[in-house]
């Protein structure tokens, strides 16, 4: 039985993963650097030192990873001032979980003000008992720390807590934490590794809701 639900944000609740992929080029250009193929994909779902280490892998150990990430965040902050597109089925899923008194949390690698801004822009904040940002944990996805903290705030056992994720790192984190992990693919389809980790794959949030209603989740 599912006693709580933890939502990833980018690419799961909102169609923002595509946006993040476009932020890297102008962010790097502002520092006189060129975008290197594969960076956006490698960075997907990460935060903090994990994110900076990936930057160093692409631009060398001596690069100013902090400056690069700060530049990325400046581009993102400007773009996220306006409402971003919601994923199909989000409203219906939130309303059903709320009506059935199942507590919800957001656990996202994004910064706190970005999470709050996206939720506030659509009037969704009231649905969530907890918001956990990548800024609040030492280890980012694929480490399960962010999901474990969210479950602690919800007061639920990971074994009975549903994690909804679109990214590979997110699925890895959910599985590592012992959560009921459902992948809802966005930019990347599930591969053999993901199929070996997740509990179930759903094509969209409408299907997640249908599985909850029938008790398959």
Predicted regions and their residues:
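Homeobox/homeodomain signature
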Residues: 25, 33, 74-76, 105, ...
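Asp-based, Mg2+/Mn2+-dependent phosphohydrolase catalytic module
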Residues: 1-3, 95-98, 111-217
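Short linear functional motifs in flexible/disordered or boundary regions
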Residues: 23, 36, 63-67, 84, ...
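Residue-level detector of anion-binding/catalytic polar loops
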Residues: 34, 103, 180
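Short, contiguous strand/loop micro-motifs
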Residues: 11-12, 38-39, 80-81, 106, ...
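Conserved SAM-binding loop
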Residues: 13, 44, 104-107, 139, ...
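N-terminal helical cap/lid subdomain that shapes the substrate entry/recognition surface
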Residues: 2-100, 113
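Conserved catalytic-core motifs of eukaryotic protein kinase domains, centered on the activation segment
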Residues: 18, 108, 117
